[in-house]
Curated annotation (Swiss-Prot):
The cysteine framework is VIII (C-C-C-C-C-C-C-C-C-C). Alpha-conotoxins act on postsynaptic membranes, they bind to the nicotinic acetylcholine receptors (nAChR) and thus inhibit them. This toxin provokes a nearly complete and slowly reversible inhibition of both the human adult (alpha-1-beta-1-epsilon-delta (CHRNA1-CHRNB1-CHRND-CHRNE)) and human fetal (alpha-1-beta-1-gamma-delta (CHRNA1-CHRNB1-CHRNG-CHRND)) neuromuscular nAChRs. Keywords: Acetylcholine receptor inhibiting toxin, Disulfide bond, Gamma-carboxyglutamic acid, Ion channel impairing toxin, Neurotoxin, Postsynaptic neurotoxin, Secreted, Signal, Toxin. The keyword Membrane does not apply. It comes from Conus radiatus. Residues 21-46 form a propeptide. The keyword Ribonucleoprotein does not apply. Contains 5 disulfide bonds. This is Alpha-conotoxin RVIIIA. Transmembrane segments: none annotated. Expressed by the venom duct. Residues 1-20 form the signal peptide. GO terms for cellular component: extracellular region; host cell postsynaptic membrane. The modification 4-carboxyglutamate is found at E63, E68.
Amino acid sequence: MMSKMGAMFVLLLLFTLASSQQEGDVQARKTHPKREFQRILLRSGRKCNFDKCKGTGVYNCGESCSCEGLHSCRCTYNIGSMKSGCACICTYY
């Protein structure tokens, strides 16, 4: 009888720990959706029109970017590992 109660206690304890871990995972996913969304937009630049952003240097990038939807774009100098130069960057706000 005692071994059955012990086994039930262990199962209950494991179930409680598993459900609290799952709850923590859900909370972790809820905390940073806006920051993740901004990071993806800034990295991908898919919503920007790259053709209109032209310039010759760090301070010579034009301000003529256009974005789709509610996003705003700015033309800025981008230093990348593959290519540096003026680029449109999308922002969420």
